[in-house]
UniProtKB/Swiss-Prot annotation:
Although the SET domain contains the active site of enzymatic activity, both pre-SET and post-SET domains are required for methyltransferase activity. The SET domain also participates in stable binding to heterochromatin. In the pre-SET domain, Cys residues bind 3 zinc ions that are arranged in a triangular cluster; some of these Cys residues contribute to the binding of two zinc ions within the cluster. It comes from Bos taurus. This is Histone-lysine N-methyltransferase SUV39H1. Zn(2+) 3 binds at C186, C222, C228, C232. Belongs to the class V-like SAM-binding methyltransferase superfamily. Histone-lysine methyltransferase family. Suvar3-9 subfamily.
Amino acid sequence: MAESLKGCSVCCKSSWNQLQDLCRLAKLSCPALGISKRNLYDFEVEYLCDYKKIREQEYYLVKWRGYPDSESTWEPRQNLKCVRILKQFHKDLERELLRRHHRSKPPRHLDPSLANYLVQKAKQRRALRRWEQELNAKRSHLGRITVENEVDLDGPPRAFVYINEYRVGEGITLNQVAVGCECQDCLWAPAGGCCPGASLHKFAYNDQGQVRLRAGLPIYECNSRCRCGYDCPNRVVQKGIRYDLCIFRTDDGRGWGVRTLEKIRKNSFVMEYVGEIITSEEAERRGQIYDRQGATYLFDLDYVEDVYTVDAAYYGNISHFVNHSCDPNLQVYNVFIDNLDERLPRIAFFATRTIRAGEELTFDYNMQVDPVDMESTRMDSNFGLAGLPGSPKKRVRIECKCGTESCRKYLF
């Protein structure tokens, strides 16, 4: 038995840092973990809990990484080398002092409630940083994700799993395309109109990868059966998000939002709306539950008929956090790539105008396109953000908080 186990390995359930902390707690050297007699008694600041000033000397109550709260100690500032943590502590302290007392200069001793707030804020930052790392570990796209909350003490959403593509529900099948194009150059020399032409539609992009079709018309991209390669100009949505984006807490009661950290050119692809694909019957059942909770993320796939719905409540990507606006900077398009079932399009967001770095990304939850255009996609009437009021029996009008000049005052 022992012979058969040679060469086997198992994953450790503790992180590298946690193992180092265990060594220091037990006062054990471990060269494999980088713990030697020289650094065995090196301590790392996890966060700062309190502040006081005695005469002209500043002191901080330090929570040490790997040690319980009871082992926290008061340390003079000159003993601390954690510049980033010190700066963040004072930034949080000054912001809260301004909010509470309309002044930013710290007192010689902090009120216990203020000290407790700073501890909760430090713990929140650590939780958000771990969540940010988790999101980036799971993403398959080029664009990085950052997370910020400078508004309240809310941490990562519970029971939300980041996914990069549709999660197919029970009884639903995504059939793979059987054929692809034979083009030498899909943009300039398309054979038989390339993949769009094979479906009797127009080529969607220009040579910069910007959509040139009007909203409501479908996009047919090259697929896994096509002769062309990854750099084909008709492969845009399938390459995923390429902009660095930030999930941030809004300061006007709209919950989480998303802003771009880079400039986005007009008509450029920004992101897909992904989640669980469920039947309309299942969507109706879930919608009644979500109504009672005051939160729902249902998106009808009604390109040709209303058979399926995307539910991003618990499984989704960064689009889960994009807010509504009556004057949005994102527009929805139906996209077909490896699955050509018109009842199951992929939902892609493109920029309606140039979007500046730092600007929030939004789309209209109650989208409308030209009524003569039957190839439309609209949000389900149940769509809403977490925390919005709702009723399982009688739909209430939800007040819009987008704040734009063209605001309709109500989402639905």
